[in-house]
């Protein structure tokens, strides 16, 4: 059964490693050393829920509901554009240290709300967990399916906690004005690039839906 665990671990790692909204947010919280362990835990728990839903049957709901998929897609586009705009605004600030200090004043609940939006409004999360993991894990018998799910969940926990701790450890180097400007520019570009990709997919999906 361990072979199924390592298959899930490898696939989960491959899907979670690329820079996206969730990873960018965890990294930034680690650099700020602001509730970064709590955010890593909440991200991992969110992934746990999504992975279990996808592997144990939730994928059918998304695939059979084109309007739900469209709603998730365009909600994600709007959020990613807004998130990217915030990153660009911080990067272009004449006093980036002051802008970063203002971010540090955010309360715990606002940070949690942003984390939930970054996770649950990102359509790629549903495609990864419901479509990819759901199609692969759904073909397995009950016991192998559990080990496969455990492997993918382990990848999420290891990655988010590792990323948060590493970012906090490197914070003295990454918190400089130059580093913050570069990080925010990269995050803004990635968020807008993903948003444009999603918008293109959303338009194609809408054309197929109404044709």
Curated annotation (Swiss-Prot):
One of its GO terms (cellular component) is plasma membrane. Signal peptide: none annotated. The chain crosses the membrane at residues 1-21, 37-57, 68-88, 111-131, 147-167, 182-202. Induction: Transcriptionally regulated by ArgP. Lysine has a negative effect on the expression of argO. The keyword Membrane applies. GO terms for molecular function: L-arginine transmembrane transporter activity. Keywords: Amino-acid transport, Cell inner membrane, Cell membrane, Membrane, Transmembrane, Transmembrane helix, Transport. It is a multi-pass membrane protein. It is found in: Cell inner membrane. It catalyses: L-arginine(in) = L-arginine(out). Pfam families: LysE (PF01810). It comes from the Bacteria. InterPro entries: Arg_export_ArgO_enterobac, LeuE-type, Lys/arg_exporter. HAMAP family: ArgO. Belongs to the LysE/ArgO transporter (TC 2.A.75) family. Involved in the export of arginine. Important to control the intracellular level of arginine and the correct balance between arginine and lysine. This is Arginine exporter protein ArgO. It comes from Escherichia coli O6:H1 (strain CFT073 / ATCC 700928 / UPEC). The gene is argO.
């Amino acid at each position: 059964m361990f072979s199924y665990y390592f298959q899930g671990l490898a696939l989960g790692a491959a899907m979670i490693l690329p820079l996206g909204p969730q990873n960018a947010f965890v990294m930034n919280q680690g650099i700020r050393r602001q509730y970064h362990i709590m955010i890593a835990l909440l991200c991992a728990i969110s992934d746990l829920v999504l992975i279990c839903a996808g592997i144990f049957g939730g994928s059918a709901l998304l695939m059979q509901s084109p309007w739900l998929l469209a709603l998730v897609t365009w909600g994600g586009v709007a959020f990613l554009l807004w998130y990217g705009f915030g990153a660009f605004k911080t990067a272009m600030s004449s006093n980036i240290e002051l802008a970063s200090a203002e971010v540090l004043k955010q309360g715990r609940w606002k940070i949690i709300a942003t984390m939930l939006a970054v996770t649950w409004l990102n359509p790629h999360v549903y495609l990864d967990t419901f479509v990819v993991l759901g199609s692969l894990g759904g073909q397995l018998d009950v016991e192998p399916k559990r080990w496969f799910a455990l492997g993918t969940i382990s990848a999420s926990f290891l990655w988010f906690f590792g990323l948060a701790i590493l970012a906090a450890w490197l914070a003295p180097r990454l918190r400089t004005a130059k580093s913050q400007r570069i990080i925010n520019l990269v995050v803004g570009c990635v968020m807008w690039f993903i948003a444009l990709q999603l918008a293109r997919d959303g338009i194609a999906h809408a054309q197929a839906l109404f044709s």
